Curated annotation (Swiss-Prot):
Residues spanned by motif 'HIGH' region: 11-21
Family indicated by similarity: Belongs to the class-I aminoacyl-tRNA synthetase family. Glutamate--tRNA ligase type 1 subfamily.
Name the record gives this protein: Glutamate--tRNA ligase
Protein's organism: Bacillus mycoides (strain KBAB4) (Bacillus weihenstephanensis)
InterPro entries in the cross-refs: aa-tRNA-synth_I_cd-bd (IPR045462), aa-tRNA-synth_I_codon-bd_sub2 (IPR020751), aa-tRNA-synth_I_CS (IPR001412), aa_tRNA-synth_I_cd-bd_sf (IPR008925), Glu-tRNA-ligase_bac/mito (IPR004527), Glu/Gln-tRNA-synth (IPR000924), Glu/Gln-tRNA-synth_Ib_cat-dom (IPR020058), GluQ/Sye (IPR049940)
Pfam families: Anticodon_2, tRNA-synt_1c
Motif ('KMSKS' region): 252-256
Gene3D superfamilies in the cross-refs: 1.10.10.350, HUPs (3.40.50.620)
Localization annotation: Cytoplasm
PROSITE patterns named in the record: AA_TRNA_LIGASE_I
MF annotations from Gene Ontology: ATP binding; glutamate-tRNA ligase activity; tRNA binding; zinc ion binding
């Protein structure tokens, strides 16, 4: 009988949820749910100096915001806990002591200065830097001498000589390493805290993880973890290493690159929809059959096949993300779009926090104009700018429109029509434009474009009668007057 699939997402609380980490979590989530398996969250917090306040909370909060849930973890418990590595130190201690007793690991008393000197010497000789094994076979006398000096040892794993480590990667197919390319590596630091490779191998075994899906940058860790598995006689899980995410210059996405928004929290703050972010991330290095790109979470779960994980780097296309979010925005009701947009108008100082019912209705109508056009909530500030200014600047294309011979006649006639209106309703504005057409004989672009540019400052935009009605008679007449003088 085949084991139930068990996968894990194991973030370090060294920062907030990054798009790359979110993708790792999402692919593990889809892999588990597709196969009726278990999805586990484990917090790898042993690098205490790098942990940041709120890092763990951010990871969990924004995974939930994206629509993911998990079967075991720090917040939901489970039979394989604890799920936070700093709470598992006794487990690691028992196991590394076992390796020491079986001479599969040993204490290394070399100082940081000695290790650095060794490394520099290797580089100077054109060699690949790796631990040369200086303390691999210390005598009792040497050990006593180092301890008398007050040296605190780290513990190194004794890498087997002349051994091949080969595995069939779920993404890359067959991958091979040779043990002679590795020096004996540290499994317990001088402060008694286990290193990443030791703790991960122990946790993955004890938590009965069947598949390890992670980023390509972890592939060199795999043979070290395989060595630890073999040292304990444990079954080795299946590995899959997802390709890197690259920017439009085809360079690895760097957290320091501020030209790209990279943290899930930021997308939420900008008024993106979690379903759209989920959809976009699911296609970063994985592709469905066919050309369709917009799918629900349930559809992704149903069709997720690890065999379709890409072997090529995944391109992070910001414009595509905007397009995708727009697809989801168009499906939302107006209440949701207002909820995503209004806080940004408040933040920009366009409207106050405490609006009257009349003001609320007006703002709602303004937002409704851009419902189908909007890519994300914060975009409303730029899109709706013309409604919050007394005067508008005419773009170059608009200035050309206003040079037309018919423009003064059209605008004067339209101003007269507006003056006569009792209520600025879209239907009344539309009728006023038709009346100008009948009066002046101008139609099509010669009619609509001067009115649009003079009143909105733009050559393109929302339905013109609706926009003019919301701008209000006084503002529109002032703008027309400024054009015709």
């Amino acid at each position: 009988m085949e084991k139930q699939v068990r996968v894990r997402y194991a973030p370090s609380p060294t920062g907030h949820l990054h798009i790359g980490n979110a993708r790792t979590a999402l692919f593990n989530y889809l892999f588990a749910r597709h196969q009726d398996g278990k999805f586990i969250i484990r917090i790898e917090d042993t690098d205490v100096k790098r942990n940041v306040a709120g890092g763990e909370e951010s990871q969990l909060k924004y995974l939930k915001w994206l629509g993911m849930d998990w079967d075991e973890g720090v917040d939901v418990g489970g039979e394989f806990g604890p799920y936070r590595q700093t709470e598992r130190l006794d487990i690691y201690k028992k196991l590394y002591k076992d390796l020491l007793e079986r001479d599969l690991a040993y204490k290394c008393y070399m100082t940081e200065e000695e290790l650095e000197a060794e490394r520099e010497g290797q580089i100077a000789r054109g060699e690949t830097p790796r631990y040369a094994g200086n303390h691999r076979d210390l005598t009792e006398e040497q050990i006593k001498g180092f301890e008398a000096e007050g040296r605190i040892p780290s513990i190194r794993f004794r890498v087997p000589a002349d051994s091949d480590y080969t595995f069939k990667d779920l993404v890359k197919d067959e991958v091979a390493f040779h043990s002679n390319d590795f020096g004996d590596f540290v499994i317990v630091k001088k402060d008694g805290i286990p290193t990443y490779n030791f703790a991960v191998a122990v946790d993955d075994h004890l938590m009965e993880i069947t598949h390890v899906l992670r980023g390509d940058d972890h592939i060199s860790n795999t043979p070290k973890q395989m060595m630890i598995y073999e040292a304990f006689g444990w079954d080795i899980p299946k590995f899959g290493h997802m390709t890197l995410i690259v920017n439009e210059s085809r360079k690895k996405l760097s957290k320091r690159d501020e030209s790209i928004i990279q943290f899930i929290e930021q997308y939420k703050e900008l008024g993106y929809l979690p379903e759209a972010i989920f959809n976009f991330i699911a296609l970063l290095g994985w592709s469905p059959v066919g050309e369709e790109e917009v799918f629900s979470q349930d559809e992704f779960i149903k069709m997720f096949d690890a065999a379709r994980l890409s072997k090529s780097p995944a391109l992070f296309d910001s414009q595509k993300l905007k397009w995708m979010n727009n697809q989801y925005m168009k499906k939302q009701d107006l209440d949701t779009v207002v909820e995503l947009s209004l806080p940004h108008l408040v933040k920009a100082g366009r409207v106050g926090e405490n609006l009257s019912e009349q003001e609320q209705a007006w703002v709602r109508d303004v937002i409704a104009l851009y419902h189908d056009q909007m890519s994300f909530g914060a975009e409303i500030v730029e899109l709706s700018e013309m409604f919050f200014k007394d005067h508008v600047d005419h773009e170059e294309e608009g200035q050309e429109v206003l040079k037309g011979e018919q423009v003064p006649e059209v605008l004067r006639a339209f101003a007269d029509q507006l003056e006569a209106l009792e209520a600025m309703e879209p239907a009344a504005v539309k009728a006023a434009i038709k009346a100008v057409q009948k009066e002046t004989g101008h139609k099509g672009k010669n009619l609509f474009m001067p009115i649009r540019v003079a009143t909105t400052g733009q050559t393109h935009g929302p339905e013109l009668p609706n926009a003019i009605a919301l701008l209000g008679k006084e503002k529109v007449l002032n703008r027309i007057q400024k054009v015709i003088g």
